[in-house]
């Protein structure tokens, strides 16, 4: 499956940054980093959401399906920025990589049929390329199951909001896996990101203590 790479441009001390920027607003002394950290914790606990928009993450998402990346793009709160690998530069000679969903992979006949279709598409793309058809046109044959690669920038508030929706047990399984990978990569990046992930990146039912979804999985009760 795919992997998440947190780039070095990412702020290593997001909580301290939140507290520092909030301190400017409050006319506080921002020369003491310990006080800035505590102020950042206060902002988080008080849900002063605007301050969460200061720390940015820069990540490479590599090896996930074009389908799940398309869904990743739909969550645009906080003005994220992203660039995706161009379909013009796919190596048709060696073919494209693709994702096989677990429900298909566990069935031998279904898996064989799925892979056969991918091979047919790869052969068709190679043939069209030989005819001199521009790749911007042949790319219309590329499937959503093809893996792709993007680089993206998101602030902490945007990622928290995404986690509440996309870590839900009813979310698309590859998206849940992708977000788990994001959480693990950020945990490994710094202690302050680990704190944010462990305390604020979770399904909204866990964050709120009740479920707001009409079609609940039953994990949490609906709000009375």
Q: Where are the model-predicted features located?
A:
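Family-specific signature for flavin-dependent thymidylate synthase
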Residues: 1-224
């Amino acid at each position: 499956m795919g992997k998440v790479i947190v780039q070095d441009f990412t702020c290593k001390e997001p909580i301290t940054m939140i507290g520092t920027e909030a301190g400017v607003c409050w006319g506080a002394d921002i020369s003491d980093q310990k006080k800035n950290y505590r102020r950042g914790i206060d902002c988080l606990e008080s849900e002063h959401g605007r301050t969460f928009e200061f720390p940015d993450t820069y990540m490479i998402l590599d090896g996930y399906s074009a389908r799940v990346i398309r869904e990743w793009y739909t969550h645009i709160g906080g003005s994220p920025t992203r660039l995706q690998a161009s379909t013009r530069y796919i190596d048709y000679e060696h073919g494209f990589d693709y994702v096989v969903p677990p429900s298909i992979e566990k069935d031998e006949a279904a898996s064989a049929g799925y892979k056969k279709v991918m091979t047919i598409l790869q052969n068709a793309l190679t043939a069209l390329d030989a005819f001199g058809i521009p790749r911007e046109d042949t790319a219309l044959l590329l499937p959503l199951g093809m893996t792709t690669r993007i680089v993206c920038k998101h602030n902490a508030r945007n990622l928290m909001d995404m986690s509440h929706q996309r870590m839900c047990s009813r979310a698309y399984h590859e998206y849940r896996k992708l977000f788990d990978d994001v959480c693990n990569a950020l945990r490994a990046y710094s202690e302050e990101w680990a704190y944010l992930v462990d305390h604020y990146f979770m399904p909204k039912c866990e964050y709120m203590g009740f479920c707001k979804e009409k079609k609940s999985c039953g994990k949490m009760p609906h709000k009375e």
